[in-house]
Structures are given as C-alpha cells and as structure tokens.
Design a protein with these regions (language model features):
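Generic detector of intrinsically disordered, low-complexity, polar/charged segments
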Residues: 9-10, 111, 152
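Common nucleic-acid-contacting/processivity interface regions adjacent to the catalytic cores
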Residues: 121-173
C-alpha cells in the first residue's frame, strides 16, 4: 500500500493542488457534470510518464470509476486509460518523447531545476513549503503550457492532438 501527498492538476491554466485523492476525484467529477462529459465527449487528463504513476493510480481509479479500456505501448506502459464516465488519461511523455524538463523548456513555467527531496516522508497532511508548492504548480502548469504550444504550432486542439509523437510525425509527412 502507498499514498500520494499531492494531486496537483492544471485546468485551462488554473492550478489546483488537492492533497487527497477523494478531493481530487470529486473535483474531476464536478467538472464532468458541469461540462457534460460522456464517453463521446471526453475529459482528457495528461499525466507525464503515466506508466510510472499507473500501478498506484489504477487501483484508486478503478475502485472509484470501474474498469477502464487501456491502450498499452508495452506491458505496464499505458498510452491511454479510458473510463466509461468519459474521463481519459493520456501519457504526455509519449506525446513529447522527452522529459518534462525538456518538454517545458521555453514555457513561462518550466519544470523547476532539481528534484524534491524524496527521502522526506510526506503525507497529504504534511504542509508543503513554498519551494515544494511551487514545484507542484510548475510541473502541471508547465505541462499545460507545453501542450498549448504544441497545439498552436501544429494547428491542433484537444480533440485532434495525436496520442503520440509518432502519430504527430506521421501526420506531418
């Protein structure tokens, strides 16, 4: 068993930092209701290196939203996870084919240099200092900006953005 101490999320350039999965899931479900999300009208959530988060996240997500359809590039390396409620997770690492630091280069909110000290024991109740909070914010806001930049540079929108860099290259050929 494990737990996450932060579920930072960027929605249209606005960052929220729920500390508990239940709070994050309720936020996502509220957005789904407000935006009338369905299997045909999806809420797409990008996670950089979804495969890394997969083992932990899939347990929480399937308990909450049921089984999902998954598209894998390799065993335990999902490209997408689609739930029947219209929520779809996509791996932005496959889209950019580069680290989050490299994907966010030139963005207003680049990934912060250095890593958090992962030897520090944190729970959802552990206060985040300013540096830790900024690190969480920059990760998701920088990713949002990088995706927006890619959409603008290639004439895509959320519905037409390819799943992977390979698909992007094929479209340009």
């Amino acid at each position: 068993d494990g737990f996450a101490y932060s579920f930072q999320t960027c929605i249209g350039g606005l960052v929220v930092v729920p500390r508990y999965f239940e709070d994050w899931a309720e936020l996502i479900e509220t957005l789904c209701d407000k935006w009338r999300v369905t299997e045909k009208r999806k809420l797409i959530i990008y996670v950089h290196n979804l495969g890394y988060e997969f083992t932990y996240l899939i347990q929480l997500l399937t308990l909450r939203w049921g089984d999902c359809k998954a598209l894998y590039t390799k065993s335990r390396k999902p490209l997408t996870l689609e739930f029947s409620n219209g929520i779809e997770f996509r791996d932005s690492l496959k889209l950019f084919q580069k680290s989050l630091a490299r994907a966010t280069e030139g963005c207003k909110h680049e990934k912060m240099k250095g890593d958090l000290d992962y030897t520090v024991y944190r729970t959802p109740d552990t206060p985040l200092d300013d540096k830790e909070f900024a690190y969480c914010v920059n990760d998701v806001l920088g990713l949002y900006e990088a995706i927006e930049r890619m959409e603008k540079e290639h004439g895509f929108n959320a519905a037409t953005l390819p799943l992977s860099n390979t698909a992007l290259v094929k479209q340009e050929v």
